[in-house]
Amino acid sequence: MTDMERRGRATEAFFGRRKGKALREQQAETLNSLLPAFLIDLSAAPPEPLTSLFPVPVERLRLEIGFGGGEHLIHRALETPSTGFIGVEPFVNSMQKLLSRIGETGASNIRVYNDDATQLLDWLPDGALDQIDLLYPDPWPKRKHWKRRFVSKTNLDRFHRVLKPGGLFCFASDIDTYVNWTLIKCRDHGGFEWIADNAADWLTPYEGWPSTRYEAKARREGRSSAYLTFRKV
């Protein structure tokens, strides 16, 4: 990456902290031993076909941006072993949790990236992905910080480029302003069609959806969630 690209990326601050509590010795060992085997190296060109990132045969490719505790990602990977999953998470503690679960379950259809998701998106070839999941992203609730929200014209352009024709962008949130923001951004972009006929289509969790800690927290605090699905057109 050039110095100019680094300066440009400095303005794309979509995430906050990189670390939480200090990892215990065993947790640090898990992270250090497993991360190299699952980490995508962006200094190398994307392999052809991209499915060869995985040591097992996969038919579809799915990206989850900001996987948090990894509950959803590991659930989907075990549920659909014929899909290759790429998870992006810059938060060290969350990455350790996912890698620990990978070690426990033996899931081999997952690869990860531990920095800014826009770097990975720009590395991916055109039309590479079947689906992108952005689930309970940081809402940046203060209006002055809304420009930091991951859903933006620039990132929707990225999504549109890397999705296959008819590929899906799935967005879940319990923050009404972010749900409305995403609907407006996707409508104005013009490259995405919202798949919804009635309220049940966005108030009902996705098929096979595992409850996550973020969703549980929202319910405890009296907030309902929206589950939006957009198709690339």
Swiss-Prot record:
Locate the residues binding S-adenosyl-L-methionine. E64, E89, D116, D138
Q: Which InterPro entries match?
A: SAM-dependent_MTases_sf, tRNA_(Gua-N-7)_MeTrfase_Trmb, tRNA_methyltr_TrmB_bact
A molecular function (GO) held by this record is: tRNA (guanine(46)-N7)-methyltransferase activity
Active site (UniProt): D138
Give me the residues that bind substrate, please. K142, D174, T212, R213, Y214, E215
EC code(s) of this entry:
2.1.1.33
Entry keyword annotation includes Transferase: yes
Q: PROSITE patterns from the entry?
A: SAM_MT_TRMB
Could you tell me the keywords of this UniProt record? Methyltransferase, S-adenosyl-L-methionine, Transferase, tRNA processing
Q: Which Gene3D superfamilies match?
A: Vaccinia Virus protein VP39
Its cellular-component GO annotations read:
tRNA methyltransferase complex
A single Pfam family it belongs to is Methyltransf_4
Q: Which reaction does it catalyse?
A: guanosine(46) in tRNA + S-adenosyl-L-methionine = N(7)-methylguanosine(46) in tRNA + S-adenosyl-L-homocysteine
Pathway(s) this gene product operates in, as recorded in its UniProt entry: tRNA modification; N(7)-methylguanine-tRNA biosynthesis
> Entry's HAMAP family?
tRNA_methyltr_TrmB (MF_01057)
Query: What family does the database annotate?
Result: Belongs to the class I-like SAM-binding methyltransferase superfamily. TrmB family.
* PANTHER family documented for this protein: 3-DEOXY-D-MANNO-OCTULOSONIC-ACID TRANSFERASE/TRNA GUANINE-N 7 - -METHYLTRANSFERASE, PENTACOTRIPEPTIDE-REPEAT REGION OF PRORP DOMAIN-CONTAINING PROTEIN
Say what the protein does: Catalyzes the formation of N(7)-methylguanine at position 46 (m7G46) in tRNA.
Name of the protein: tRNA (guanine-N(7)-)-methyltransferase
Which source organism?
Rhizobium johnstonii (strain DSM 114642 / LMG 32736 / 3841)
Q: Which gene codes for it?
A: trmB
